[in-house]
Regions:
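Secreted/periplasmic proteins that engage bacterial cell-wall peptidoglycan
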Residues: 21-35
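Short connector loops at helix/strand junctions that flank enzyme active sites
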Residues: 17-19, 34, 50-54, 72
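Short, charged surface segments at domain edges that flank catalytic/cofactor-binding sites
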Residues: 1-21, 46-49, 88, 95-96, ...
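Short Cys/His-centered divalent metal-binding micro-motifs
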Residues: 27-30, 43, 54-79
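Histidine-centered catalytic micro-motifs used for acid/base chemistry in nuclease
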Residues: 35-39, 57-58
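Short Fe-S-cluster ligation motifs
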Residues: 56-60, 82-109
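Short clusters of hydrophobic/aromatic residues that line enzyme substrate/ligand-binding pockets
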Residues: 36, 70, 96
Length: 109
């Protein structure tokens, strides 16, 4: 595992927790090609960066799909818990909204 990327075990734990779907829109994703989004961004490094509570499975990349939407609309993303403040070391305490399920979740590790 690099400083900014979770190991394969964590990646699969998050993918399975999210039922192989984009956490936001619900699109089914391939276990061989999916993206994880860091709720507290990688540029705000800390020891919990790659914990499951800081990660959600998303469709697209930084330039398309829900992953792009998160970064293009930060105000909405903070409100919906898709982004977490750089000063928050406990993303597990910040509810995250799933649009296709129409509800909030608290993610654990």
């Amino acid at each position: 595992m690099s400083k900014t990327n979770p190991d394969i075990e964590t990646r699969m734990k998050v993918f399975n927790r999210d039922h192989g779907r984009c956490f936001i829109c619900g699109r089914f994703l391939s276990a061989y090609a999916f993206n994880l989004h860091h709720r507290r961004m990688r540029s705000h490094a800390w020891e919990g960066l790659n914990l499951p509570s800081n990660l959600i499975t998303v469709c697209g990349s930084g330039t398309m799909g829900c992953h792009a939407r998160i970064h293009a609309h930060p105000k909405e993303s903070y409100v919906k818990g898709w982004l977490v403040s750089a000063y928050n070391d406990h993303p597990e305490d910040v509810p995250v909204f799933s649009e296709y399920r129409n509800r909030e979740f608290l993610l654990n590790n």
